């Protein structure tokens, strides 16, 4: 790992990509501190907020707590992406057709995803501006329809800029731009979290100091165990044996070798967690339009609180559902079976074609069950950590944040390593 990091700066092209990515993240962090005009951020207080707003603040690197131009983060884009992927599943025939057209079709779908981001972002921004002014009186000193619309437009523009920033990182930097931005937001909150632990559990602890240190050490061990578990599950594979039949090409026998088909335990990576989080946050944000005094809005806000038993169950089910959904987008058993048949390959004891497809699908369902359950369990661990250690809710230790940070870090390092390997072998190819 450390060798890979040192090698990055020896390759000019890769070095430029890494520097470009870092510069884009600096722009993101600067924007997180630029407040929306016409607002008073001093009235916002997200300490001990264990609801959707606390989540959004954590994953935006504190941008929501500053009520900055990036307060909504990249979540509307993720929600729009989910909607577009659902519509591609023969719901909208034109979208399904574009999905099969390769690069040209993907460009058209990406354009519609951008349009969807703007629409959903504006709805969410309007709900956020009205709702936050109800929750935190004085946030908008002179509320009116025109002021609310202006603030919604500024927040939507901030999300659109982040979307563009993510696309630039993907095209000219390293890793998936959207995931990198979310990663940066979570990582930016780590120093504040550590400082909060110190101020609440170490500073002026008195006679409780030793006990608090023991609890914090146990917590650190638990977090380390989660990180190891996440890496293990992300790297775990099920190897299905594949045999290729011998055939004659001219007078030479070709094929006959044995290999394997690798299926990951968690083929979807951390994308299901990001998708679930985006969808989980959306309803309470929109409910904010009606204020906490409205009975239905109050119920939605309370239910979509991840410390609430129902909210916890909904969040876990969303993660499990999206893991299955995204796994079968990433891995297509029908296409795999078809390719094996065309190449003269078969799984020992399984007939080529439909039987192979059914076999791969069955194994994929079992693997995904384990992977999705692991993601769901780890994602809701912060609730138990916080209660066990009696820590402020704002710290949001472990769980979703750890999954995203470790998952994105692993994926990015793999991409960088692949780039390094490609450059190392360039001389042999020539």
Curated annotation (Swiss-Prot):
<keyword id="KW-0812">Transmembrane</keyword>
<keyword id="KW-1133">Transmembrane helix</keyword>
<feature type="transmembrane region" description="Helical">
    <location>
        <begin position="213"/>
        <end position="233"/>
    </location>
</feature>
<comment type="subunit">
    <text>Component of the Sec protein translocase complex. Heterotrimer consisting of SecY, SecE and SecG subunits. The heterotrimers can form oligomers, although 1 heterotrimer is thought to be able to translocate proteins. Interacts with the ribosome. Interacts with SecDF, and other proteins may be involved. Interacts with SecA.</text>
</comment>
<dbReference type="InterPro" id="IPR030659">
    <property type="entry name" value="SecY_CS"/>
</dbReference>
<dbReference type="GO" id="GO:0043952">
    <property type="term" value="P:protein transport by the Sec complex"/>
</dbReference>
<dbReference type="InterPro" id="IPR026593">
    <property type="entry name" value="SecY"/>
</dbReference>
<feature type="transmembrane region" description="Helical">
    <location>
        <begin position="67"/>
        <end position="87"/>
    </location>
</feature>
<protein>
    <recommendedName>
        <fullName>Protein translocase subunit SecY</fullName>
    </recommendedName>
</protein>
<keyword id="KW-0653">Protein transport</keyword>
<dbReference type="GO" id="GO:0005886">
    <property type="term" value="C:plasma membrane"/>
</dbReference>
<keyword id="KW-1003">Cell membrane</keyword>
<keyword id="KW-0811">Translocation</keyword>
<feature type="transmembrane region" description="Helical">
    <location>
        <begin position="390"/>
        <end position="410"/>
    </location>
</feature>
<feature type="transmembrane region" description="Helical">
    <location>
        <begin position="309"/>
        <end position="329"/>
    </location>
</feature>
<dbReference type="GO" id="GO:0006605">
    <property type="term" value="P:protein targeting"/>
</dbReference>
<dbReference type="Pfam" id="PF00344">
    <property type="entry name" value="SecY"/>
</dbReference>
<comment type="function">
    <text>The central subunit of the protein translocation channel SecYEG. Consists of two halves formed by TMs 1-5 and 6-10. These two domains form a lateral gate at the front which open onto the bilayer between TMs 2 and 7, and are clamped together by SecE at the back. The channel is closed by both a pore ring composed of hydrophobic SecY resides and a short helix (helix 2A) on the extracellular side of the membrane which forms a plug. The plug probably moves laterally to allow the channel to open. The ring and the pore may move independently.</text>
</comment>
<feature type="transmembrane region" description="Helical">
    <location>
        <begin position="145"/>
        <end position="165"/>
    </location>
</feature>
<keyword id="KW-0472">Membrane</keyword>
<dbReference type="InterPro" id="IPR002208">
    <property type="entry name" value="SecY/SEC61-alpha"/>
</dbReference>
<feature type="transmembrane region" description="Helical">
    <location>
        <begin position="177"/>
        <end position="197"/>
    </location>
</feature>
<dbReference type="InterPro" id="IPR023201">
    <property type="entry name" value="SecY_dom_sf"/>
</dbReference>
<comment type="similarity">
    <text>Belongs to the SecY/SEC61-alpha family.</text>
</comment>
<dbReference type="GO" id="GO:0065002">
    <property type="term" value="P:intracellular protein transmembrane transport"/>
</dbReference>
<feature type="transmembrane region" description="Helical">
    <location>
        <begin position="270"/>
        <end position="290"/>
    </location>
</feature>
<feature type="transmembrane region" description="Helical">
    <location>
        <begin position="18"/>
        <end position="38"/>
    </location>
</feature>
<feature type="transmembrane region" description="Helical">
    <location>
        <begin position="369"/>
        <end position="389"/>
    </location>
</feature>
<keyword id="KW-0813">Transport</keyword>
<feature type="transmembrane region" description="Helical">
    <location>
        <begin position="118"/>
        <end position="138"/>
    </location>
</feature>
């Amino acid at each position: 790992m450390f060798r890979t990091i040192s090698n990055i700066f020896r390759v000019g092209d890769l070095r430029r990509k890494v520097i470009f990515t870092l510069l884009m993240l600096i722009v993101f962090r600067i924007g997180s501190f630029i407040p929306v005009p016409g607002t008073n951020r001093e009235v916002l207080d997200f300490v001990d907020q264990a609801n959707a707003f606390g989540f959004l603040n954590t994953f935006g690197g504190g941008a929501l707590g500053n009520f900055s131009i990036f307060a909504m983060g990249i979540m509307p884009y993720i929600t729009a992406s989910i909607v577009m992927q659902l519509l591609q599943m023969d719901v909208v025939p034109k979208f399904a057709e574009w999905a099969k057209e390769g690069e040209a079709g993907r460009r058209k779908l990406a354009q519609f995803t951008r349009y969807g981001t703007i629409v959903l972002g504006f709805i969410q921004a309007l709900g956020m501006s009205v709702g936050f002014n109800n929750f935190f009186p004085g946030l908008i000193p002179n509320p009116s329809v025109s002021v609310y619309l202006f603030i919604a437009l500024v927040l939507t523009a901030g999300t659109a800029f982040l979307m563009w920033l993510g696309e630039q990182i993907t095209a000219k930097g390293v890793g998936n731009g959207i995931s990198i931005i979310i990663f940066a937001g979570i990582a930016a909150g780590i120093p504040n979290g550590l400082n909060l632990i110190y101020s609440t559990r170490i500073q002026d602890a008195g006679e409780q100091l030793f006990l608090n240190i023991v609890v914090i050490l146990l917590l650190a061990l638990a977090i380390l165990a989660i990180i190891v578990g996440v890496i293990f599950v992300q790297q775990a594979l099920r190897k299905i044996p594949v045999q290729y039949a011998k055939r004659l090409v001219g007078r030479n026998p070709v094929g006959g070798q044995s290999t394997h088909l690798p299926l990951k335990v968690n083929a979807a990576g951390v994308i299901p967690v990001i998708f679930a989080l985006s969808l989980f946050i959306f309803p309470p944000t929109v409910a904010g339009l009606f204020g906490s005094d409205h009975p239905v809005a109050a119920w939605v806000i309370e239910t979509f609180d991840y410390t609430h038993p129902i909210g916890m169950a909904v969040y876990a089910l969303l993660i499990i559902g999206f893991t299955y959904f995204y796994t079968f987008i990433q891995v297509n058993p029908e296409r795999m079976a078809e390719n094996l048949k065309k190449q003269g390959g078969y799984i020992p004891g399984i007939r080529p074609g439909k039987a192979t497809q059914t076999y791969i699908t069955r194994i994929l369902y079992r693997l995904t069950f384990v992977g999705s359950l692991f993601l769901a369990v780890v994602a809701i661990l912060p609730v138990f950590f916080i209660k066990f250690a009696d820590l402020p809710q704002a710290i949001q230790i472990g769980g979703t944040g750890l999954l995203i940070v470790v998952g994105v870090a692993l994926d990015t390092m793999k991409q960088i390593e692949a780039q390094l390997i490609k450059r190392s072998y360039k001389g042999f190819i020539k």
